[in-house]
Amino acid sequence: MRRILCALTLAAYPIGGVLADAQTSATEIAVHGSHNAKVTLVYEHELPNVPGKSVKGVLVEYGPGGASVAHTHPASAFIYATVLEGAIVSKVNEGPETVYRAGESWSELPGDRHAVSRNASSTEQARLLAVFVLDTGETNLVLPY
């Protein structure tokens, strides 16, 4: 399972020429109610060996003190998130608030509620890459609850 998740994370980085039919242009995603946060779809590609499923890479950038509102994701979405820079405070469902630092990861299962997602610092930027595996037709990736 860990190898599959690592492969999906690597697949989220655009690789010129290798995935010619993949979307590699960035598209900002509107997340209403977030503070000092930018969410950008940086990659998407249908999974050729899993009909009806796609992988999407989403870059989340928090400025100092930045945060997202409590949210969930499409019911079909499995998410593997890796902190690229800084530190992120995350709380999924009724679990504890956990601080993840650069290089650390967590996952969210279909139906999970992301109660807390914020930058742990009030002075430094933080970034994470969330890799979604979900139904191909899903376009609204962040849903308030």
PLM-predicted stretches and their roles:
Residues 49-53, 74, 82, 99, ...:
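Extracellular/periplasmic catalytic domains that process cell-envelope and extracellular macromolecules
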